[in-house]
């Protein structure tokens, strides 16, 4: 897969998916425990999640971001146990 980059007529929309706060996160707990073992004592907790970078044609206006939000709700996140956010970063 080629790296996502800003090009003429192409935009990127970012979807971040996290477990809901009330859902147990064993992977995050394992990472936090490893941080302690490795000497990173300032780390109190970790929640693990997923990040999707979706490349779309054209600008990432409100309508396009709304379509990606619908995609996230239907395909990228499990609404029973996960919450998500969608945003279009500013091009560099």
Positions of predicted regions on the chain:
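Non-catalytic terminal accessory/regulatory regions of metabolic enzymes
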Residues: 1-92
